[in-house]
Amino acid sequence: MKKKLIIVVGPTASGKSDLTFKLAQDLKSEIIVCDAYQVYKEISKGINKPEIENLNAIKHHFVNHVSINEVWHIKRFKEEIEELINSNMDKNFILEGGSNLYIDCLINNYQLNELDLTLDYSNLSNDELYEKLQKLDFEESLKISKNNKKRLIQALRIIESNNNTKKSVLDKNNKEPLYDFFLIRMIIDRDILYKKINDRADKMFKNNWREEVEQLIKANGNSMMNTNALKALGYDEIYNSIIENRETNLDLIKQKTRNYAKRQETWIRNKFKIDFNFSNYDQYNELLDKCKAFLNDKK
């Protein structure tokens, strides 16, 4: 019988963390945070890490897990999460989606090769990256916006590390899933979501987000922007504003975050098999019953 795992996914600022925490309390579960940036110890102000009280109340895995100077990538995440789950088969885990690709690689059990981290795309413009992707993998280029530099680089790194199209790499390395999943999708009105994103950005900025980046620059020098940790939304704009001695364009950060949330919703809708759509806490008891039934099903 496969290990059963509950997953909560949804766009940023949709309330995933609150729902995951409440479910973990009621199901006596530990939480696995599947986020590409909460894993880092040195950044916190702009990535909505769990509150200290929550971290103390329930075990959260992969939060404050590595230093920004360490190599961290999706392959290492998959290896470590499988080791964690397989060595604790008696425990319940709820996975909180932050980076949908992390969730996708676990659900589909992708066998990932080491990515060539020496491949450097930092000097290429978005247009140059997109043109390169079109030449190497035209089908993949149709799925990615020319403005989404992070995903363009991510796709190119997979393609060039494996000398094959992204689809061929994933198809070749896709094996039978190791676990059974119950996937919960957060549903939230677009206007409400965008207001939450804007309000959260204001709160983060008032909570010394810019000062955090200033301290990172002092501690690590200007080369810090080459670390994966500082590719988190908003950090590049804050970094550039400090280096250029200007005010941070918080409206730009809000706009990029809203665009990111929209892309997340599209990904979730198109890629994942949803078991429960959660839109308000009137549904909570129904959801909890379904989660218990899933965990207790011995099939």
UniProtKB/Swiss-Prot annotation:
It catalyses: adenosine(37) in tRNA + dimethylallyl diphosphate = N(6)-dimethylallyladenosine(37) in tRNA + diphosphate. Its cofactor is Mg(2+). Substrate binds at T12, A13, S14, G15, K16, S17. InterPro entries: Dimethylallyltransferase (IPR039657), IPT (IPR018022), P-loop_NTPase (IPR027417). Keywords: ATP-binding, Magnesium, Nucleotide-binding, Transferase, tRNA processing. It is an enzyme of class 2 (transferase). It holds the Pfam family IPPT. One of its GO terms (biological process) is tRNA modification. Its EC number is 2.5.1.75. ATP binds at G10, P11, T12, A13, S14, G15, K16, S17. The record marks S99 as: Interaction with substrate tRNA. GO terms for molecular function: ATP binding; tRNA dimethylallyltransferase activity. Belongs to the IPP transferase family. Monomer. Catalyzes the transfer of a dimethylallyl group onto the adenine at position 37 in tRNAs that read codons beginning with uridine, leading to the formation of N6-(dimethylallyl)adenosine (i(6)A). This is tRNA dimethylallyltransferase. It comes from Malacoplasma penetrans (strain HF-2).
